[in-house]
Amino acid sequence: MAQLSLQHIQKIYDNQVHVVKDFNLEIADKEFIVFVGPSGCGKSTTLRMIAGLEEISGGDLLIDGKRMNDVPAKARNIAMVFQNYALYPHMTVYDNMAFGLKMQKIAREVIDERVNWAAQILGLREYLKRKPGALSGGQRQRVALGRAIVREAGVFLMDEPLSNLDAKLRVQMRAEISKLHQKLNTTMIYVTHDQTEAMTMATRIVIMKDGIVQQVGAPKTVYNQPANMFVAGFIGSPAMNFIRGTIDGDKFVTETLKLTIPEEKLAVLKTQESLHKPIVMGIRPEDIHPDAQEENNISAKISVAELTGAEFMLYTTVGGHELVVRAGALNDYHAGENITIHFDMTKCHFFDAETEIAIC
């Protein structure tokens, strides 16, 4: 169990590339924190600084109140799971899981107890005598997790552990890691570029871009209240739709659209002096409905209709704007078809067109 405090953490390489910029985060005991962002955003570098595998260029890392900047990795009471399983091919599953404990000269009976306990949790009991080559990708990843679990560390770090698995296995392992967190009741920090993993697993998500933290919050918070256009577009699949326009009276207008803004949102826009200035409206695909209501109805033409099973993803053209609409599968939709869509303006978001920061 551990609490972490990252205070003004910086990472600058010798070539003056600034990879992580003024990273601040307080992590409570037993939290499941996910760092998410595109490639090169600094998420893995931050994780490696926590692990002691990268030197911290500036700021302080505290674990349970103790400054860890100069403490070697092996003394930080941290266990790490990497993207590649890093298993010894000539060793059995048991020996792979026990290897670190043997290096620490832990008593044989303690090693046996921990390995069997971890194997029971991970469903590996029947595979303990097998070698990695005889296992599936998901089973090998469980072995890598087991090797970390047996250390009984205060903090578990995971660097894109599921990226080598196929889609079905990723879904399965997501659930298994979440269950594992509940069973171990320990602090976990997980790195991924996959926003679905972040949304489904985290107690809090840290969204990064270009080495800078964009937003920290619970999955529902960052989805429903994104801090800026980057977060709004990165979290959610398909991504949020964005339309540039202006506010005229109680309407959001473009050259081809005119949508009525709810009073509560209009009041915020007025206090932020956003009237008659360039502004961006964002609306998620599930908040555009392929049916007519009393107002905010627009004619759209379907360019692509993707059936995913329970629903359609409709890629439409609306007055010169490309918009994605999520629709139920009760009706059939086809490319080239004209439909009427309704904007649920109570669910829309408005962003400053210049700063891209959320207004409401």
UniProtKB/Swiss-Prot annotation:
Entry GO CC: ATP-binding cassette (ABC) transporter complex, substrate-binding subunit-containing
Keyword check for Nucleotide-binding: yes
Keyword ATP-binding in record: yes
Binding residues for ATP: G37, P38, S39, G40, C41, G42, K43, S44
Taxonomic superkingdom: Bacteria
Example GO BP: carbohydrate transport
Keywords: ATP-binding, Nucleotide-binding, Transport
An example molecular function term from Gene Ontology annotations: ATP binding
InterPro entries linked: AAA+_ATPase, ABC_transporter-like_ATP-bd, ABC_transporter-like_CS, ABC_transpr_MalK-like, ABC_transpr_MalK/UgpC-like, Mo/tungstate-bd_C_term_dom, NA-bd_OB-fold, OB_MalK-like
SUPFAM superfamilies found in the cross-reference section: MOP-like, P-loop containing nucleoside triphosphate hydrolases
Domain ABC transporter residue range list: 4-235
Protein family per UniProt: Belongs to the ABC transporter superfamily.
Protein name: Uncharacterized ABC transporter ATP-binding protein YcjV
Gene it is expressed from: ycjV
